[in-house]
Amino acid sequence: MWTMFNNWKIFEDNLGFVPSEEIKDKLNEYYKILVEENLKYNLTRITNEEDVYEKHFLDSLLFTKETKIDNQKIIDIGTGPGFPGIVLKIFFPETDITLIDSNNKKINFLNIVIKKLNLKQIEAKHARAEELARIENEKYDIAISRAVAYLDVILELAVRFLKIQGKLILLKGPRADEEIKNSKNIDQKLKIKLTNKQSLADTGFGERINLFYEKEKSTPELYPREYAKIVKESGKK
Ligand SMILES: C[S@@+](CC[C@H](N)C(=O)[O-])C[C@H]1O[C@@H](n2cnc3c(N)ncnc32)[C@H](O)[C@@H]1O
């Protein structure tokens, strides 16, 4: 076996189950492709095996303790090298996943992963969220995003994709509370409500806060605005 990773206990401890052999094989293959293609596609600063499995793979899954994932239609906005979207697909093959990123290099890499891992019901699209959201209005049960933008920015980029009562899940770092305070009630304007906050203790790879929103009503026509406008108003990227 090319990879030496064997600390599967950390997955069991944090998720409550041991990944199957098929899941382990697919994660190992994903890690191999990530490391092999990293220089060419400029994917991640983290390449050490233990770190990738914990800081990228496991971190992409911790939110699933708070919400049941089965066959939902999910969009991962600003997926980069596939976090959390590819990892979710490996663990929950019944999902229907769309990965989007504005950087076409990432999309080329994701298509290699999808092909080599023989993943089904998953598509990688080169698109900007604020543009695609107008085309794919209210199409998704879940929109998810990790480390893409400041809270008020990502809320506006993501909300139109969701069906009414759809969930927006934001995988955030320790400053999520500060971002909520600074978001100037944009959630009310966007007709979306914070329903749950998952604070994860620092188990050696940084404190994480995952935010769960629910869409209450259709998105007002104004949103999302052009990216430059959103960022200008936010004052944050
Ligand atoms: C810091 S990376 C995070 C990647 C991945 N989600 C992760 O957790 O490692 C942010 C990604 O979001 C993408 N991105 C930024 N703004 C975007 C937008 N408006 N629409 C689509 N993708 C965007 C970037 O190209 C980049 O790949």
UniProtKB/Swiss-Prot annotation:
Domain of life: Bacteria
This protein's record includes keyword Cytoplasm: yes
Gene3D superfamilies associated with the record: Vaccinia Virus protein VP39 (3.40.50.150)
Entry binding sites for S-adenosyl-L-methionine: 78, 83, 129-130, 146
InterPro entries reported in the protein's UniProt record: rRNA_ssu_MeTfrase_G (IPR003682), SAM-dependent_MTases_sf (IPR029063)
Keywords assigned by UniProt, alphabetized: Cytoplasm, Methyltransferase, rRNA processing, S-adenosyl-L-methionine, Transferase
One cellular-component annotation, GO: cytosol
Enzyme Commission number, as recorded: 2.1.1.-
Range of residues in the leader sequence: none
KW Transferase (keyword) present: yes
Sample GO molecular function, one term: rRNA (guanine-N7-)-methyltransferase activity
Subcellular location: Cytoplasm
Record-linked Pfam families: GidB
Reported function: Specifically methylates the N7 position of a guanine in 16S rRNA.
Family to which the UniProt record says this protein belongs: Belongs to the methyltransferase superfamily. RNA methyltransferase RsmG family.
Name used for this protein in its record: Ribosomal RNA small subunit methyltransferase G
Organism whose genome encodes this protein: Mesoplasma florum (strain ATCC 33453 / NBRC 100688 / NCTC 11704 / L1) (Acholeplasma florum)
